[in-house]
Amino acid sequence: IAKNGEQATEAWGKSLVKNLARKPQGNDRAQIIAVASGEADIAVANSYYIGIMLSGTAGEEQREAAKKVQMIFPNQQGKGTHVNISGAGILKYAPNPNNANLFLEFLLSDKVQKHMVSKSYEYPIVNVAVSKEMSGFGLDFKEDNTSVKVYGEMNPDAIRLMDRAGWK
């Protein structure tokens, strides 16, 4: 809504609903499995779930399903791909902001970031290598720079818009 306006976003939402291969169900991995099995041609899923599936930690069946799909980063010619964040911060009235800051610095250290990306299959915030499962998808993609603050501000409007579009 913030980037394209309410009218264009609602038209997009209606097209999305009209093109669903099935009623929305399951989690991200269920969407990936639906594509792998031929039930759908395309799905929206967080990239780290494909990493988890490819790692084999979720079982051989999920690994094989993930091998059958291709991940793409949409909107590369436009605004870029939406990126979720896993974040941490210091509350305004934190009783010990100095230690909280030290903890944040620890979380941003190469050692911790390497551990996190190798276990979560997320992309790192600092310049450390991504997991081998994720490296095959590429690192050079355009990210949407919309502030996460906007998501919260626009959330009620987005929910009403998707209700009008017929999302279930």
Residue spans of the language-model regions?
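Ligand-binding pocket segment of bilobal, Venus flytrap-like solute-binding proteins
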Residues: I1-P74
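Structured segments of extracytoplasmic/periplasmic soluble domains
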Residues: K3, N19, A34, G38, ...
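A short, terminal or domain-edge coil/loop segment
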Residues: A34-S47, Q62-A66, V83-I85, E122-M134, ...
